[in-house]
Each structure stands twice: as structure tokens, then as C-alpha cells.
Amino acid sequence: MYDYIKGTLVKITAKHIVIETNGLGYIVTVANPYSFSDQMNQTIQVYLHQVIRDDAHLLFGFHTEDEKEVFLKLISVSGIGPTTALAIVAVDDNQGLVAAIDNSDIKYLMKFPKIGKKTAQQMVLDLAGKFAELPAETTNTTANQTAGNQQLDEAMEALLALGYKSTELKKVKAFFEDTNETAEQYIKSALKMLMK
């Protein structure tokens, strides 16, 4: 098991980042890869969780230990795998998640990709009262301003990778067409819209 990795950020894609350390490039799947845009070619530290399967060894990365803790609690719920947990972590609204779990708000929980009624109920059963020590937000990085349409396309790719449907994303993309923000800002805003 690994706690964290420290190395140079050398690549960002819609699904993951690549961190080079000691001559090896580690693929680390993260909730919002573009939140690392301002740290390209710099030394970064990312908290890790390793998943070992028969066909792959996967690394999931997080900005903070609190974000990792949310992820670990989510994957402890039957029916929630790492990809679904990342999609939930990506919303970056712990207060909404905690309130929904503590208040048994099944409808809110079902707005996350791949979360049906049964899984939402299981989340409430397994996690109610277990998030008391977590802060309101898990990440606090910002990205540099760049070309809007390319950034919007990258944000939509990342949301597709998290499991959102292209039909949902077309409506969201149309809303942002005339704006100029970073991919990270688009993702955060889009996730808030999708959760309404």
C-alpha cells in the first residue's frame, strides 16, 4: 500500500495524471485531472489509494487526506466501486453529501452517476454519522485561465470519464458555450448543475 507519491507532474488527460518519480511514470486516476493544470512540470504530492485486481494494479489520487478519506468511506459501501466513488468526490461538496446521507435524502444521492435507489439506501445505512470530522470542501487548487472552448471540451471529456451521460452533458455544455473558464472551473460548475 502507498500513502502518497511525490514527483513531477508530466501529463494530464481526461481520466488521469502521470507523475514521474525516479525515472518511472505513474498513472494516477483522479477525480478532476484538470485541477492539477497549474502544477504542470512541477513537483507535486498526491495522496494515493491502490486497487489490485487480477488484470490491473490501479492508483487513485487525491489532493488532500480528507478527500482520500471520503473516497475510502464511499468504496466501503456495497455497490460503490472506485470509479463511482471518484465521481462523488469530484462534486467537491462534502456538506451536501454528508447532509444527504445524515438526512436520508435518497433523491439527492441518486443524482450521482451509477447510484440507484438501492445503493443510495445502502450509503445511508453504512455512512450515516461517519463524516463528522471532515471539512466542507476537499480541494483548494485553482488553474490558470486558458482558451475557453478547448477547456470546455476537456471538462466534458472528464465528466464523461466519471460516468455522466452525453445527453446530460450536451445541456450543460450549451449553458457554458459563451463563457471563458478553466476546465477545472467548468467541471465544478457542471457538477453543481448536474446535482440540482
Curated annotation (Swiss-Prot):
Superkingdom of source: Bacteria
Region Domain II: start-end pairs: 64-142
Main location group: cytoplasm
Region annotated Domain I, chain positions: 1-63
One Pfam family per UniProt: RuvA_C
InterPro entries: DNA_helicase_Holl-junc_RuvA_I (IPR013849), Hlx-hairpin-Hlx_DNA-bd_motif (IPR003583), NA-bd_OB-fold (IPR012340), RuvA (IPR000085), RuvA_2-like (IPR010994), RuvA_C (IPR011114), RuvA_C_sf (IPR036267)
Membrane-spanning ranges: none
SUPFAM superfamilies: DNA helicase RuvA subunit, C-terminal domain, Nucleic acid-binding proteins, RuvA domain 2-like
Function: The RuvA-RuvB-RuvC complex processes Holliday junction (HJ) DNA during genetic recombination and DNA repair, while the RuvA-RuvB complex plays an important role in the rescue of blocked DNA replication forks via replication fork reversal (RFR). RuvA specifically binds to HJ cruciform DNA, conferring on it an open structure. The RuvB hexamer acts as an ATP-dependent pump, pulling dsDNA into and through the RuvAB complex. HJ branch migration allows RuvC to scan DNA until it finds its consensus sequence, where it cleaves and resolves the cruciform DNA.
Protein name: Holliday junction branch migration complex subunit RuvA
The gene coding this protein: ruvA
